[in-house]
Design a protein with these regions (language model features):
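Mature-chain termini and adjacent capping regions
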Residues: 1-158
Length: 158
């Protein structure tokens, strides 16, 4: 299954590159915190913000990334649709095991084709392209779908 994912989305065959102004890393556990204008990249996927926490599994593979900022920015190419997906939130979690990105706090996802999703919490499936949005009493889920570019009325009677 991982090979099929890697073929359909080459980003997951790439190493994760991290940079920031300050790093506190535990070499034994592989967990660390980057602070100050951090950037985390894996292929076309990119996170930018103020602070990032990285957790690795015992085998040193990436487990998750938790990014904090005001806002944190996220961008990735969806290789199935060809769309560029961008997002922002106060907190973004990348689950490298489930290939999910969870945006929390004033969350927004947009595509370069004009689709837009706003909510308190948005979960985005990196390989499936699925989006789940949850609102609350202060912010309901909002979806914007662009109009068709070339619409013509179909004759009622032929």
């Amino acid at each position: 299954a991982i090979d099929a994912i890697a073929q359909s989305d080459p980003d997951f065959n790439q190493p994760v590159e991290l940079s920031g102004d300050f790093l506190n890393l535990n070499l034994n556990t592989g967990s660390g915190v980057y602070k100050g204008n951090f950037i985390a990249k894996q292929g076309s996927m990119k996170f930018e913000g103020n602070e990032i926490k990285v957790k690795q599994k015992a085998n040193k593979e990436l487990d998750n990334i938790i990014a904090l900022g005001n806002p944190v920015k996220f961008k990735k190419k969806n290789y199935s649709s060809g769309e560029i997906v961008s997002g922002s939130a106060k907190k973004i979690t990348y689950d490298a095991n489930k290939l999910l990105v969870i945006l929390e706090g004033e969350a927004e996802i947009t595509t370069d084709l004009g689709k837009s999703f706003r909510s308190q919490i948005i979960t985005y499936g990196l390989t499936s392209g699925e989006i789940e949005a949850k609102g609350n009493s202060q912010r309901r889920v909002q979806i914007i779908i662009p109009p068709n570019s070339a619409r013509k009325s179909t004759p009622i009677v032929e």
